[in-house]
A protein has these predicted regions:
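Glycine/small-residue-rich interface belts in oligomeric ring/scaffold proteins
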Residues: 6-58
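Internal, well-folded beta-alpha domain core
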Residues: 57-226
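Short amphipathic
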Residues: 1-3
Length: 226
């Protein structure tokens, strides 16, 4: 997870109806996140040849207050997956901004328990990549830390064609995290995300870490209006 400071004027036009931007200590973030999905099921049914695959997404953070409850969530700007069928299902179920490109991933063990993780995709002739190298053992999330803010968002929101928003719940345990000794995002930011993200994402990240991950359940969405 590579995290970048972003200005409000960049993110405000992308916020779905009924939610507000979520800050950590007064700062707004966008994150470039790589995942490896395993044993994926849609409505409880495994899809042959589509159960294990990587994803790389760009997201930012929002919140919604409902009857005294604060629901912290994410909004995806772009999500890359390696198969068209995966992108099609996600767009149909959640209207998520998925795009299918050739992708690959690698996990390389290093000395003293460290490892390197890489996700790569090919938008044209050249491969571009997101990578990170860990050091030290994993640790629990610290309360009120930036890592906790980035990982502890259990709702997803996205705009719908009629102007409303879709809200869906995501369930997983708290993730342990690894510190990162180096991280790289070698990508044509303008070509992938648009010129508006150049200044915020085409630079050294504010922070980077790697999470262990776990089983994740994504629930059916419901419409939200302001």
């Amino acid at each position: 997870m590579l995290n970048y400071v972003a200005p409000e004027e960049l993110l405000a036009p992308l916020v779905p109806a009924g939610v507000d931007l979520d800050h950590w200590r007064g700062t707004l973030y966008v994150s470039v996140v790589g995942f490896l999905f395993r044993d994926t099921r849609v409505l409880g049914v495994p899809i042959p040849a589509h159960r294990t695959f990587p994803e790389v997404n760009l997201r930012f953070y929002v919140r919604r207050d409902v009857a005294g409850e604060t629901r912290r969530g994410v909004v995806f700007v772009c999500e890359l997956v390696p198969r068209r069928a995966i992108a099609l299902v996600a767009r149909l179920l959640y209207n998520e901004p998925y795009r299918a490109l050739p992708m690959r991933h690698a996990l390389v063990a290093q000395q003293h328990g460290a490892f390197a993780r890489e996700y790569a995709w090919r938008p044209s002739r050249e491969w571009t990549r997101l990578s990170a190298r860990t050091f030290g053992p994993s640790r629990v999330l610290e309360a009120n830390s930036e890592e906790e803010f980035i990982t502890e968002h259990y709702w997803g929101y996205n705009k719908q064609p009629d102007g409303s928003a879709l809200e869906y719940r995501v369930e997983h345990p708290r993730w342990r995290v690894y510190e990162v000794s180096e991280a790289h995002f070698d990508c044509d930011v303008v070509g992938l995300y648009g010129t508006q993200f150049h200044d915020s994402v085409n630079c050294k990240p504010s922070s980077a870490f790697l999470a262990e991950g776990s089983q994740v359940t994504v629930f059916t969405g419901e419409r939200v209006t302001r």
